[in-house]
């Protein structure tokens, strides 16, 4: 009887006693593990750690989610680069560029490639290419020099990964040195000089570079730059160490042209 009375008393006290709020337990995070990549929550390491077993179960997904977040960030960066580029090319080539570049192709989507860039890029030291979306970008340092839409040219330049050397910064990842610069000359389109009958724009924007070169550029000369183009295409035969050698090669016909504007410099290195 006494035991029954004690139980009833305890139950009654529990029913009338006010509920005391428990102290809030601070949210626990794994030290140094709260991460957001490019504003994308990876949902792996920034959740409350409620137990070791739960956390260990989540760890298997973290590398995958981190990778997905990083890829999303890269894609946004590439899209932004294309948007900036499209905004810039809508202005058209500058007067300074127009006389020394390959003009717009049939669809009007390419940018001019300066003869000076073609010449300087042969040494593969200052310029590099990088895949940006569906285009091939030509950089000097961090500055975007030219961007060629692959869909318009069927462009397939030769890429060669160059090993990193002392005191030289080479592209990383899918940024590769531009060692097929000569192929950029073989794109369809008109040139800034007075065009001959055999030098007209190509019909199809998706032909290969070789086909385009045969159909469009046979007999054509880009005023002031044929020597540069020839050396770019035949890069292995260029001896950059001797300017005298370059002069003699020009005199032997490599860079001959009717250069009425005098745009080719005497040493064959193009406009400075």
From Swiss-Prot:
Glycans are attached at residue 134. The keyword Metal-binding does not apply. Residues 234-247 have a biased composition (Basic and acidic residues). Its main location: other. Residues 231-272 are annotated as: Disordered. Residues 1-21 form the signal peptide. InterPro entries: PTP2. It is found in: Spore polar tube. One of its GO terms (biological process) is sporulation resulting in formation of a cellular spore. It comes from the Eukaryota. One of its GO terms (cellular component) is polar tube. Residues 263-272 have a biased composition (Polar residues). Involved in formation of a polar tube through which the infectious agent is passed on to the host cell. This is Polar tube protein 2. It comes from Encephalitozoon hellem (Microsporidian parasite).
């Amino acid at each position: 009887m006494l035991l029954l009375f004690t139980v009833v008393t305890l139950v009654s006290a529990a029913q009338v006693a006010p509920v005391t709020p428990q102290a809030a337990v601070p949210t626990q995070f794994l030290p140094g593990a709260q991460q957001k990549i490019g504003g994308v929550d990876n949902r792996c390491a920034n959740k409350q750690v409620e137990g070791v077993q739960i956390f260990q179960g989540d760890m298997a997904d973290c590398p995958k989610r981190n990778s997905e977040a990083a890829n999303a960030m890269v894609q946004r960066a590439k899209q932004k680069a294309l948007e900036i580029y499209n905004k810039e090319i809508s202005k058209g080539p500058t007067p300074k560029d127009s006389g020394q570049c390959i003009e717009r192709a049939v669809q009007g989507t390419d940018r001019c490639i300066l003869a000076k860039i073609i010449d300087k890029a042969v040494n593969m030291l200052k310029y590099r290419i990088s895949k940006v979306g569906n285009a091939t970008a030509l950089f000097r340092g961090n500055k975007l020099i030219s961007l060629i839409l692959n869909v318009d040219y069927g462009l397939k330049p030769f890429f060669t990964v160059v090993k990193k050397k002392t005191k030289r910064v080479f592209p990383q990842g899918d940024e590769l040195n531009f060692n097929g610069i000569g192929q950029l000359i073989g794109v369809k389109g008109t040139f800034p000089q007075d065009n001959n009958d055999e030098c007209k724009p190509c019909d199809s924007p998706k032909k290969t570079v070789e086909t385009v070169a045969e159909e469009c550029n046979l007999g054509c000369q880009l005023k002031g730059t044929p020597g540069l183009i020839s050396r770019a295409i035949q890069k292995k035969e260029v001896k950059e160490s001797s300017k005298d050698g370059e002069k003699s090669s020009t005199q032997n016909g490599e860079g001959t042209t009717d250069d009425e504007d005098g745009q080719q410099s005497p040493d064959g290195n193009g406009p400075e």
